[in-house]
Amino acid sequence: MTHFIKGQWQAGKGHDVTSSNPANSEIIWRGQTATAEQVNAAVDAAREAQFDWFMLGFDGRLKIVEAYRSQLEANKAELAETIAQETGKPQWETATEVAAMIGKIGLSATAYNKRTGTEANDTPAGRAVLRHKPHGVVAVFGPYNFPGHLPNGHIVPALLAGNTVVFKPSELTPKVAELMVSLWEKAGLPAGVINLVQGEVDTGKALASHPQLDGLFFTGSSRTGHLLHQQYAGHPGKILALEMGGNNPLIIKGVADIKAAVHDILQSAYISSGQRCTCARRLYVEQGEQGDALVAKLVEAVKQIKVGPWNAQPQPFMGSMISEAAAKGMVAAQANLQNLGGVSLVELSHLQAGTGLVSPGLIDVTAVGELPDEEYFGPLLQLVRYSDFDQAIKLANQTRYGLSAGILADSRDDYEYFLARIRAGIVNWNKQITGASGAAPFGGVGASGNHRASAFYAADYCAYPVASVEADAVSLPASLSPGLSLE
């Protein structure tokens, strides 16, 4: 069954949809989309369940969330394989995604208490108490690149805070979502606390525009995020958290260990077939002999990257992109850059018709006068050679995005100079820029987000503060204010 509403699995009343393994086009899931009527039912169910879920208290909610963690542990092999089949990612990588989902439980519980717990202090005016309360009913829109981990990063803190959830996953990964929600059901989550509606644009619009939502948490493209931001303008009572993409720069300056630098470049640009929002899209390398040596080594290494199906043995570094359409989009992006004057050092190729399998690409765009400020969401890295560090930083900042950025440099002074001037929410030094800690906030500025960082700071947008001044009994002050008499 496709949808989970008020604790019951049910078929969709909309049109038929399927999900295919992008590495071989095999259909692995069938269902029907949710209609606006079913979306209404899901929101109503969440509203009906919300107060009792909140009144269960944090400890009671945590007990059920920890039971979900046990379900993830018990079913991690099936979940990892399902993610691999539906996204095309290699099995080694989807195993790490499931591990991140399991780890999110403990991190979210810690974040709840540190960011949004309860504090009390005695003051001359009375006892000052800070509490946090849930917003109510929130929608979670999940992406396809991390169909388990990223929606999990919204759902878990939302539930811990006392919200109820209507989950709308990517239409490209419905099977993963169905399995995730079934594990919540097995964990004993009360009916209506989480609801699943599957579908495409119409289902998403029906949910996003629902008047009974108190918030919406979105991970996906900048284009869709901006449309949601416009839609929520004029609704200050609703919380909107947007986690979007980036045109992320990586600068190389004065690195002695070329092999290590090349490794970090590969991990930054080509992991997940370039389908991470933090992936490096633009690489800035110094002109001169040292830069030439690094580029030569990089070209050699990119050509040696193993690409293959999710279950290939030995395992590949890169699996399939999410779809054949995505693969063709990357070929078109490369052709556009070539037409602008870019020179391919390693040609990106669509390896097999009917699949999302592509080889990684590296293109020198130094000669391109005005580089398009686009997030090419795939394994295509743009190389720019620079002669001046300030020029490199200026070029790196020439983007409307601001998600991740990094520098590989032996000099800490160079890093601190870069850190002070770069505009991004994630800035790494001598580490791949796809690396982020769940114990830290995750988010960007500009077109990459709306100042609602997720990960450890997700707790912040899952609850609102309630400030109270309290006393155990009504009492008169030592003296009345001027002009008052109670005689």
Swiss-Prot record:
SUPFAM superfamilies (UniProt xref): ALDH-like (SSF53720)
Active site per UniProt: 243, 277
PROSITE patterns noted in UniProt: ALDEHYDE_DEHYDR_CYS, ALDEHYDE_DEHYDR_GLU
EC annotation from Swiss-Prot or TrEMBL: 1.2.1.71
Protein name as it appears in the record: N-succinylglutamate 5-semialdehyde dehydrogenase
Gene3D superfamilies: Aldehyde Dehydrogenase, Chain A, domain 1, Aldehyde Dehydrogenase, Chain A, domain 2
Renumbered residue ranges of the record's region Disordered: 1-23
InterPro entries: Ald_DH/histidinol_DH (IPR016161), Ald_DH_C (IPR016163), Ald_DH_CS_CYS (IPR016160), Ald_DH_CS_GLU (IPR029510), Ald_DH_N (IPR016162), Aldehyde_DH_dom (IPR015590), SuccinylGlu_semiald_DH_AstD (IPR017649)
Pfam families in the cross-refs: Aldedh
Primary role: Catalyzes the NAD-dependent reduction of succinylglutamate semialdehyde into succinylglutamate.
GO molecular function: succinylglutamate-semialdehyde dehydrogenase activity
Family annotation (CDD domains): ALDH_SGSD_AstD
Alphabetical UniProt keywords: Arginine metabolism, NAD, Oxidoreductase
Biological pathway: Amino-acid degradation; L-arginine degradation via AST pathway; L-glutamate and succinate from L-arginine: step 4/5
UniProt record, GO biological process: arginine catabolic process to glutamate; arginine catabolic process to succinate
Residue numbers binding NAD(+): 220-225
EC category name: oxidoreductase
Keyword Nucleotidyltransferase: no
Similarity annotation: Belongs to the aldehyde dehydrogenase family. AstD subfamily.
Catalyses which reaction(s): N-succinyl-L-glutamate 5-semialdehyde + NAD(+) + H2O = N-succinyl-L-glutamate + NADH + 2 H(+)
